[in-house]
Regions:
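Catalytic cores and adjacent flexible loops of soluble metabolic enzymes
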Residues: 1-196
Length: 196
């Protein structure tokens, strides 16, 4: 869990001191994911990890479809077949529905295909605002724009408990699943406070 300001500094250090490709992986749970990935891209990352739309956001990595829009606006070519991604996304929707009993989030993003759907002007501008904020290292404006983008598409809101405890997405969703099995969700907030 890394905020955009920190990844901006780290990318500059990595790129000036390492001779190997840099791969950035994060989760969206605390609200940093999309902004941190954009910051990493703007500051020269070689590879970013993403998820396909219906499995993205929340405790997962940012959606490749959103990263595709950012990269297109930045003139960065992705070596990804987005038509195949759209087909896979349809299958993943069905799979996620089948696994609903195990889904910690139970919130699906609004349907969207960046190859066929047109963004409203105000949402398209949010992508431009986020890019400008990432380039100028304005973390507050970057997170504001990214959170507005995620809200428009109905991705989960940042989880303040996770943000404060700095718990990775997978650890958080596993803990929630275990507490649900024990009928002990009432202790989640206290449990999160105990995590160093």
């Amino acid at each position: 869990l890394i905020n955009p300001a920190r990844i901006s500094e780290m990318m500059q250090l990595f790129k000036s001191n390492l001779k190997i490709p840099v791969d950035f992986h994060t989760h969206c749970t605390p609200g940093y994911g999309l902004g941190a990935v954009l910051s990493a891209i703007v500051h020269g990352v070689d590879i970013v990890d993403t998820n396909i739309w219906n499995f993205a956001g929340g405790p997962a990595a940012p959606a490749i479809e959103l990263i595709y829009i950012f990269c297109k606006k930045l003139g960065i070519e992705l070596d990804v077949n987005m038509e195949a991604v759209a087909k896979i996304n349809k299958e993943l929707y069905t799979i996620r529905k089948e696994l609903e009993a195990y889904d910690a989030v139970k919130q699906f993003p609004n349907p969207f295909n960046p190859l066929t759907d047109t963004l409203p002007a105000n949402i398209d501008k949010l992508f431009d605002d986020a890019i400008a904020a990432a380039k100028s290292n304005n973390e507050e404006a970057l997170l504001e724009a990214c959170h507005a983008i995620e809200a428009y598409f109905n991705f989960p809101k940042p989880n303040e408990l996770v943000k404060k405890a700095e718990v990775p997405g997978g650890m958080y969703t596993n803990m929630v699943a275990q507490l649900k099995q024990l009928n002990s969700m009432d202790i989640l907030e206290d449990a999160m406070k105990l995590i160093p």
